[in-house]
Design a protein with these regions (language model features):
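C-terminal subregions of glycosyltransferases and related glycan-biosynthesis enzymes
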Residues: 76-80, 84, 89-158
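A short, conserved acidic/glycine-rich loop-to-beta-strand motif
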Residues: 2-16
Length: 158
């Protein structure tokens, strides 16, 4: 059970594990079995993919942007927007999703996705600059935004 708070809960987040039951990411200990944080900070805390469950009414309000000729926008862009609406509860040890990483998947083909979806990545990276508290990450996302602008310019030239 999650103890009450005055902030409205908009979703829950659980862990992923591989088919051999090894947890994806690093172990995070909590006396309560959960923490309340943002999707951006959760990425740094858990260091691995997570499985989100959002309230339907909030999820419907936050649509993924659509860019002609592109097929991808990082999901964290929307997860952050949902998190802006209320609290997200992250269960530190509860696994609800078993997974495997495929050779042709997003994690192993990041550069391909970035080059082919520069506007989708640009909206994500540019929004992350304001969300980050540490200068290192602000600079990282600023540079990634510039990289997206370069890829957009190269696509226009084709």
């Amino acid at each position: 059970a999650v103890s009450g708070s005055n902030i409205e809960t908009v979703g829950f987040c659980y862990r992923k594990a591989f088919f051999d039951n090894r947890m994806v990411g690093r172990e995070v200990l909590s006396n309560d079995g959960y923490i309340i944080t943002t999707p951006t900070d959760a990425g740094k805390i858990f260091c691995g993919d997570l499985d989100y469950v959002f309230r339907t009414d909030v999820m419907r309000e936050k649509e993924f942007p659509i860019f002609p000729g592109e097929k991808f926008v990082p999901e964290l862009y929307i997860w952050n927007k949902i998190g802006d609406e209320g609290q997200l509860i992250f269960f530190t040890e509860k696994v609800i999703y078993l997974c495997e990483y495929l050779e042709d998947g997003y994690s192993r083909n990041f550069s391909f996705y970035l080059k082919n979806n520069p506007r989708g990545f640009f909206v994500f990276y540019s929004s992350q600059i304001c969300r980050e508290t540490k200068l290192f990450y602000k600079v990282k996302y600023f540079l990634r935004s510039l990289q997206c602008i370069l890829y957009m310019a190269l696509r226009i030239g084709k």
